[in-house]
Amino acid sequence: MRKVVVIPTYWARKKSDGWQEGDAVYDHPTPLDEDGTLQRTLESMKPLKYKDFKLVLPICPTTPDIADEAEQRVIEIIRRADLKAETYVFTVGDLERVSNIVYETDTQHRTTPLLTMMGYANVRNICLLCADILAADAAILIDDDEVFEKSDWIERSIEFLGKRIYGDVVYGMAGYYINKHDQYYDDVKAEPWMTYWDRFGFKAKAFDEIIGCPPRVKRTPFAFGGAMILHRDLFQSVPFDPHITRGEDIDYVINSRMYGFTFFLDNTLSIKHLPVPKKHPQWKRIREDIYRFVYERAKIVSQYKTSNMVIVTPEDFDPYPGEFLRDDLDEKIFRSNMMLAADYMLQGDSEGCAESLNNISISRKDAMPGFDPFSRYRLNQKLWEQISEAVALKRYDMRKIMEEHNLSKTPIVRNAQRERQLQPAEIITELRKAFDFELSDDDWLKLSKLFIVETYYEDEMVFRSGDFNDAMHILLKGELLLFAGSRDSGGEVELTHLVKGDILGESCMTHTPFTLNCRALQFTEMIGIKRDDIQTLVNSDPALGVKFYQQILVKVVEKMRNNNIQSLSMGGGTVLDTFIDGEA
């Protein structure tokens, strides 16, 4: 199962500059002149047993003005953490380029408004997008203020994903937070105004029922955005609702249920949550809750029967968040804010008192969506599926954009071996050995000019599972190993060795990812031709291009016949299948 761990990281202007009008509002974005909590999170991943995942860090600045500086700060922190995992950063600029590709495939030009890094729900969608581009089977969502304390957390997180439990397939799995006291309860102090707004009390009840009791895995009405594991069938179909301002994680559970996906929680999958203390006043925090619950209730109330969807009720999400999605929500808001206003008045805080009373008015006016939230979400879901289709169609081009920010690429060391240039005559000699067809001298020369020399040192990775097959190569010297698995995940399974004269990647025209890994066992030299250059040749010189293409097909058939690859089973298919499909 291909795993992509995604950790969005939020950045703000320097502390001395402060928040400015138009900046996005997040709980605790890291000022540019501070380090924040990201390095702590990355360093906590070092003891993980298996690092056979790709790690992506979407960089979310509160304003485009600081995007470049934020990128440099994140890269500095990643370098310092020195986590031995394949790591990417994903920037606002990367998103813009990916959006342009989506835009080109979307003739109605409707999908790109979903592709933005402003707001929590939108950021979560970008996390899913990154996982999709990297061909993930499992998207593992983590936050940058968490600490891993279990070395087997990653393999635990996907243990049940895609499997059937109690009649349902597990498409969404939730872990849970523990606080600095190693408890799963919210670290808050009860106050009188909470009598009518007992959110933490109902959360505690839900946590006790789902987290605190057996069995290990059970259906859940809630999930945590920083400990959420999604199967590709779910994240390619169901987006986070861009209109939810807060609580996008639990809202995602509601949306998923509407589309027939059930979330489960694993009560052994804990992760320590150590957020920076919130500085917002209490009236503002309850206002954020008002907006989310009023919106979610409106979405539930506005449901209507439609094909392939499930009508959900507040009771489906009891005790939390269901208790705050009922008809008495308005009464809860009124009573709790009246008491909060009284508390502020006793403290002599007239502003806090006025804002608390204003919450009541907001709940009846501004918080009410001015549109049908159910129909709007259905529209966004359809647009999200179009984005997923665009990714499937243009994954190669999008992946190239992400690879530009792959921080784990082995730097190419330039020396005499690396810089050796082959003369056209040498390349033609190798091509004549590899391919059995008659060409004129001019055609051989034309073909040779499309090939480039590539070299790899001993133990250097040539490609990894999930990388795209974008070229065909002929080995001139050295030896390559094709294998499944990894050193971190309990061992490599050697499948075959390639030596001088062997051809690698002859199925590159199928435009699909590898499911195997390839590493150089000694210094290896190859000549290769890109799939784009093959296509250009077919278009510019059809006679030569078709001849060459036929030779590629011959090589595929020869590999099928002569190498007995059928006997090597791989994930329900065979290694032969992967060669045919362009994945090896």
Language model feature labels by segment:
Residues D168-P192:
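Short beta-strand-to-loop element that shapes/binds the nucleotide-sugar donor at the catalytic cleft/hinge
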Residues T245-Y252:
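Acidic donor-binding loop at a coil-to-helix junction in glycosyltransferase catalytic cores
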Residues A70-L134:
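Active-site-proximal specificity loops/subdomain of glycosyltransferases
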Residues D443, V493-Q550:
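Cyclic-nucleotide recognition modules
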Residues E209-I229:
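A recurrent flexible, glycine/aromatic-enriched loop bordering the glycosyltransferase active site
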Residues R414-E458, C508:
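Cyclic nucleotide-binding regulatory module and flanking cytosolic helices
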Residues E21-F53, E76-R80:
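Short, acidic, metal-binding catalytic loop of nucleotide-sugar glycosyltransferases
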